Regions:
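Short Gly/Pro-enriched turn/cap motifs at secondary-structure boundaries
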Residues: 33-37
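C-terminal binding/interaction regions
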Residues: 1-25, 30-31, 55, 81-130
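Immediate flanking context of iron-sulfur cluster ligation sites
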Residues: 52-61
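Short solvent-exposed loop/turn micro-motifs enriched in small/polar/acidic residues
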Residues: 26, 39-40
Length: 130
């Protein structure tokens, strides 16, 4: 079981050394969103393979430690998932990954990247139905 300090160190590691923080071009999905209360801005990117799985994911943006760390962590989790898998991801999972007691007062920051990605995945699926 991870301690509160373990969760904090993981968040700080993802903030200080973000994974996949870059604009992904070409991409199949690009969507942005923000959290005016905290000044967070996140742009999520994804490229799909021929089977409809996420082959690469990245993000750009700026904001608080939690929103940026959550986006970094999410990009690692997205690779290999289908858009349907993304639709099934829950905000509770994100909060658990970040440490529930660490981010309990900052859930909008913690779930911003997933909110953007879920919305973009739904839009892509609607627009590309055969």
């Amino acid at each position: 079981m991870l301690t509160r300090q373990d969760y904090i160190e993981n968040i700080l590691d993802h903030y200080d050394n973000p994974r996949n923080k870059r604009e992904l071009n070409p991409n199949d999905i690009q969507a942005s969103g923000g959290n005016p209360g905290c000044g967070d801005i996140v742009v999520m990117f994804a490229r799909l393979d021929e089977d409809g799985r996420i082959a690469d994911a990245s993000f750009s943006g700026e904001g608080c430690t939690i929103s940026q760390a959550a986006a970094s962590m999410l990009t690692e989790e997205l690779v290999g998932k289908t858009l349907e898998d993304v639709g099934r991801m829950t905000f509770e999972d994100v909060v658990e990954d970040l440490g529930k007691d660490v981010v309990s007062t900052r859930t909008r920051c913690a779930t911003l990247a997933l909110t953007i990605m879920k919305s973009a995945s739904e839009k892509y699926t609607r627009e590309h139905r055969h």
